[in-house]
């Protein structure tokens, strides 16, 4: 189950999180801003996904991960950089400059199936 900090109120997210843990499910808390990241720290047993896609404009910017990462560096669970990773160099930059080693890559893989440049890093 994924809990988007932009879409749910705090109490609803907490209830969904608690219920998922009771059912032995993993939870990904998705954040888009520093404020959402600070709020997500309460979900200690979750994975936290930093979504690089602006939900209002649908534009992606990997700098979102860099902007938010420092807030989450002490989170005990895995961090994920989500969306907008288009090249091998971007993936390596994210990996080398943050503690993040988990990435959600979709659109770029589908658009670049023949080139396989990003696959060589994975």
Language model: regions and residue ranges:
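Glycine-rich beta-to-alpha transition loops that act as phosphate-gripper elements at the mouths
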Residues: 29-34, 78-89, 108
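Catalytic cores of alpha/beta
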Residues: 34-43, 85-101
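Single conserved hydrophobic/aromatic residue that forms the stacking wall/gate
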Residues: 1-7, 11
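C-terminal helical cap(s) of enzyme catalytic domains, especially alpha/beta-barrels
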Residues: 67-71, 111-122
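Glycine/Thr-rich beta-alpha phosphate-binding loop at enzyme active sites
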Residues: 41-70
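Glycine-enriched alpha-helix->loop->beta-strand junction motifs that scaffold or abut catalytic
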Residues: 21-25, 42-50, 74-76, 95-103
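Short, small-residue-enriched loops and turns at beta-alpha junctions
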Residues: 8-9, 35-38, 54-60, 87, ...
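Alpha-helix-loop-beta-strand connector modules within alpha/beta enzyme cores
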Residues: 14-28, 64-77
């Amino acid at each position: 189950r994924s809990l988007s900090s932009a879409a749910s109120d705090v109490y609803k997210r907490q209830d969904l999180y608690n219920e998922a843990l009771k059912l032995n499910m993993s939870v990904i808390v998705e954040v888009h801003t520093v404020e959402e990241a600070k709020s997500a720290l309460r979900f200690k047993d979750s994975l936290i996904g930093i979504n690089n896609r602006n939900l209002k404009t649908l534009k992606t910017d990997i700098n979102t991960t860099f902007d938010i990462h420092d807030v989450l560096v002490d989170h005990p669970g895995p961090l994920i950089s989500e969306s907008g990773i288009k090249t091998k160099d971007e993936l390596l930059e994210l990996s080398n400059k943050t503690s993040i080693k988990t990435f959600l890559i979709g659109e770029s893989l589908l658009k670049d199936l023949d080139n396989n440049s990003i696959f060589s890093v994975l």
